[in-house]
């Protein structure tokens, strides 16, 4: 079915309109929905492509683990590189850029074979393209640590690096910053390393589910608690969790299906209980009156007894984009809109006449 949403355009997202295969299942669990998604993706991709497709069950990755290992909640599992936390390894370091910072490390197998230009280019990418303050690196050779921050790699530090998987012949990249920033930049550096070193597995579709999303997040700008992902999902632990737990520790029954670094579907076990709904929104700063006013259709429907239900919505356009090996949705849409959300072929949106407005009882009042 077509879905209309006010979203900014990008390579994997069409402005204004897209198609979803939307389904809801009564008296269903999260796992049952994931099994349906597995069947949809495996059968469709096997039928219409000749690439290798992951067999069910797909990997289930908790959101926290995804952010720690990949720096993103839609990881491309064709890329074998993993982000490691190296904060404790450098706790006694004399390197000022690492002091009092979260330090993320990426071990690149056989990376010591790369020349200085490669490391300079990666540093330039990190600083100019993704906003890093810098990108530290070192090679582990037979002669010992070489290049970059080699002089700060003590025997104790080297031992710590070996514990996270580094060995002679490898190179390492380090990002030091505040926790969330370091995590995000490390994720982008990981992706770029995979591309530049040609590490991405070819002719294969690697699927996974991201699960256990946080129900809430802290909004630093407004100093308040906000919903993290989907406000209408069921919190894990129900009312007891909402009443007794730190909101930032509450997880939700929310899940995303991911393939090759793209979000393919999003879904949740829905919150069908009006009391739970009011309490969940209260934590995010909404009064019961606001919930009734802004979400009246749901709130009022729930009063009549809605069955427990769960669902998801795979994106049809995005599935087609991957199955045709394109990297932009415009290539698989018959009449794509431009970046200003205009349909150039039809000349839409366009001005309407007074008669047309009168027919639908709309009046334009100019200020």
What is the meaning of each model-derived region?
Residues 1-367:
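Class II aminoacyl-tRNA synthetase catalytic cores and aaRS-like
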